[in-house]
Design a protein with these regions (language model features):
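Short linear sequence motif anchored by a di-proline
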Residues: 3-5, 15-256
Length: 256
């Protein structure tokens, strides 16, 4: 999801040339090419008991989890992973750190989506089932093609009742500051991102660039969490037409 370019920002064509040169030298740099114009807003309004029941999570570390009608990058959100004590539900912060690019400040400090799964940066985690996770979601939002501050946000869910879905996610530990200049948050953080793929037929008329990889049934969830990467990678495909419905429009929160 890209905003309007402000005065003084780098010319996008020049920046693309610099990035292309960097990626030729440092292959992991391609991880940041597709972070813009993707899913950077979603909701999770079901109970933690509902999540645990679907994914058979035996451990719950979320405390008292409230409805989350608007989850933005760098916010805390519930995630399911396989831990030392079995499958667990816990809170993580949304967004991987970007690869370090010498002499260049990343355009986006948080990699919220993973599209180029052949990148060395992402392969470090994708190939290891212990670094894969399930991200509970009840709806997600995409902007229209305007892409500026006047963009209209459209919310997608399975139907009006917003049943649980899961993004195909990955997670890692990261040491650093995930706060603000006024309120630093320095320490060890658990962070997550999730996969995107080609826009599905339901999403493409609003947002043709991409759509999240969604896992709708137990077989798909278990394949993502346990299978070798060659098998898990088969899940990177858009849902068929009719799998998603538009359930809201205009607001940056899905309060239903």
């Amino acid at each position: 999801m890209a905003g309007e370019r402000k005065t003084g920002e780098t010319n996008p064509d020049a920046a693309e040339r610099v990035l292309a040169e960097y990626m030729a030298r440092y292959p992991c740099g391609d991880a940041i090419r597709t972070v813009d114009r993707m899913c950077n807003l979603y909701s999770m309004t079901k109970s933690q008991a509902a999540i645990r029941e679907l994914v058979k999570a035996m451990v719950d570390r979320t405390g008292n989890l409230p409805p989350l009608p608007a989850i933005f990058p760098n916010r805390m959100a519930p995630v399911v992973r396989d831990g030392a004590e079995g499958r667990e539900l816990l809170m993580m912060r949304w967004g991987f750190p970007p690869p370090n690019i010498p002499g260049q400040k990343p355009r986006n400090p948080y990699l919220t989506n993973c599209r180029k799964t052949d990148s060395r940066y992402w392969q470090t985690y994708l190939k290891k089932p212990e670094h894969r996770c399930l991200v509970p979601v009840t709806s997600f939002a995409e902007p229209d093609n305007n892409q500026g501050p006047k963009s209209i946000w459209t919310w997608f869910a399975r139907d009006e009742s917003r049943p649980l879905m899961f993004f195909a996610g990955i997670w890692r530990e990261w040491e650093g500051d995930r706060g603000t200049k006024a309120a630093p948050d320095v320490g060890t953080h658990l962070v997550f991102s999730f996969l995107t793929t080609d826009a599905s037929p339901d999403v493409a008329p609003i947002h043709p660039d991409a759509t999240p990889v969604l896992l709708l049934d137990e077989a798909a969830r278990e394949q993502w969490m346990t299978a070798p990467w060659e098998e898990a990678a088969l899940l990177r495909k858009p849902l068929p037409a009719g799998a998603l419905k538009i359930v809201a429009s205009g607001s940056k929160a899905d309060e239903a």
